[in-house]
Amino acid sequence: MKLKLVVCLPGIGYHCDKALLYYGRRVAESIGYKEYKNVEYVNRIGNVKGDPVKMQAAFEDLYGQTEEILKDIDFSGYDSILFLSKSVGTIIATTYAERHKIPCRHVLYTPLEATFDNCSDNLSGRAIAFTGTADPWVESTAAITDRCQKAGIPVHVIEEANHSLETADVWKNLKNLEKIMMQTAEFIK
């Protein structure tokens, strides 16, 4: 039996039991990822939006917490490793995998531009991304799609969706969530 692990890394103010990471993890479980680790870190920096210094400090603090949380996992004992991440969690996940040389795949929910700063060349064929056109954390949807395309990462753009990939229409959100999870499942298989 092949051992498969999924690691979930949330964003600030978004925990692993919210829709994208919860259902992403459940989809992975249905495909054979029976073990999972939710990374639950605490934002000790406060409001970081629009402040590059605070954003960097938050990343460093959250990354340090992630190192501590994941330190006892022997990643070499798994046949397949999947990182499901959201927002700043996408930066932490890609950086962690890169620094620890973990052969894995990534599902990037609402990545930020910094997600691609140090690792985009290494994600081709090993990642998928989802972004919304009304995401206030992204200056330009085109910038995200461009970075993904240059890195060979399929990117799915959800019209009118915010940083949680939600719109003002609850029924549209449910349809979008189903579509996002189906695309996630296709990538994981």
Model-derived features: positions:
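Serine-hydrolase catalytic machinery in alpha/beta-hydrolase-like enzymes
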Residues: 2-77
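Catalytic histidine neighborhood in serine/cysteine hydrolases
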Residues: 33-38, 148-167
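Catalytic histidine-centered segment of alpha/beta-hydrolase-like enzymes
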Residues: 49-50, 161-176
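Conserved alpha/beta-hydrolase fold motif
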Residues: 80-83, 106
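Gly/Ala-rich beta-loop-alpha elbow adjacent to hydrolase catalytic centers
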Residues: 83-94
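A conserved short beta-strand
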Residues: 101-113
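Short beta-strand/loop motif that positions the catalytic acidic residue
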Residues: 123-124, 129-131, 135
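Acidic catalytic loop of the alpha/beta-hydrolase fold
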Residues: 133-139, 163
